[in-house]
A protein has these predicted regions:
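Short secondary-structure boundary/capping segments
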Residues: 3, 42-43, 65-68, 106-107
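Short, conserved charged micro-motifs
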Residues: 20-21, 83-88
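Helix-adjacent hinge/juxtasegments
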Residues: 66-77
Length: 135
């Protein structure tokens, strides 16, 4: 039987400091924090997705996840329903350094405009808007 997947439910992000990472995603990207599981793990929720935060050094048998637990190797693109200039202004207000952008890119749904920064672990964070021009 052949099938296709429908959407992404969650992903696991490896981080050096769960508290610092969770606070950054809450403050900068407006995500909601949630504790889950018997071990009271930390997740970040947004839209219909979530990011589970796995601390570096957590026992492999406690997490069913990637073979290598390395912080700072992620490249994540998030969609925002605001203009790119608003993203730039918000990142500046949060004290987050912009690495690149606004720049035109091709997303899953077509042309978009992206602004790039890094989270506390060095993961590349792309914040994109489906607007036709960088302004």
């Amino acid at each position: 039987m052949r099938f296709t997947v429908d959407r992404l439910d969650h992903l696991v992000l490896h981080c050096a400091d769960v508290e610092k990472t969770a606070s950054w995603y809450q403050r900068v990207l407006g995500m909601d924090r949630e504790a889950f599981g018997d071990e009271r793990r930390t997740a970040l929720k947004f839209g219909g997705q979530k990011i589970n935060l796995r601390p570096i050094g957590a026992a492999a048998e406690d997490w069913r996840t990637s073979a290598q637990a390395v912080a700072g190797t992620g490249d994540l693109c998030f969609i925002a329903a605001v203009r790119p200039d608003d993203v730039v202004g918000h990142l500046h207000q949060c004290g987050v350094m912009i690495e690149s952008g606004p720049a035109s890119r091709e997303g899953a749904l077509g042309p978009m405009v992206s602004v790039y920064c890094r989270d506390p672990d060095g993961n590349l964070i792309e914040i994109s808007s489906y607007f036709n021009e960088p302004g």
